[in-house]
Amino acid sequence: MAEVVDERVYTVPLRDAKKAPLKKRAPRAVKALRQFIERHMKAEEVRIGNDVNEKIWERGIKKPPSKIRVRAVKYADGTVEVRLAE
């Protein structure tokens, strides 16, 4: 694994996904999370962990959470890994 450059904990708002049609809400929430992390961590590549994806999809495609708390770890090669904050 590459050297860790930065590690932050964010509460990411996913409320804008609720404006999407019912059958597109969870995918829209994943995109919103990816865009938020790219913007705030200045990342070239964002890898979303399985645990985060499962948390977003937990209640199905129609009802993603309004916000999610995640831990973002940036490595020296510019990639960011996103996991659930505990």
Curated annotation (Swiss-Prot):
Signal peptide: none annotated. GO terms for cellular component: cytosolic large ribosomal subunit. GO terms for biological process: cytoplasmic translation. The keyword Ribosomal protein applies. It holds the Pfam family Ribosomal_L31e. SUPFAM superfamilies: Ribosomal protein L31e. Keywords: Ribonucleoprotein, Ribosomal protein. InterPro entries: Ribosomal_eL31, Ribosomal_eL31_CS, Ribosomal_eL31_dom_sf. CDD domains: Ribosomal_L31e. GO terms for molecular function: structural constituent of ribosome. It comes from the Archaea. PANTHER family: 60S RIBOSOMAL PROTEIN L31. Belongs to the eukaryotic ribosomal protein eL31 family. This is Large ribosomal subunit protein eL31.
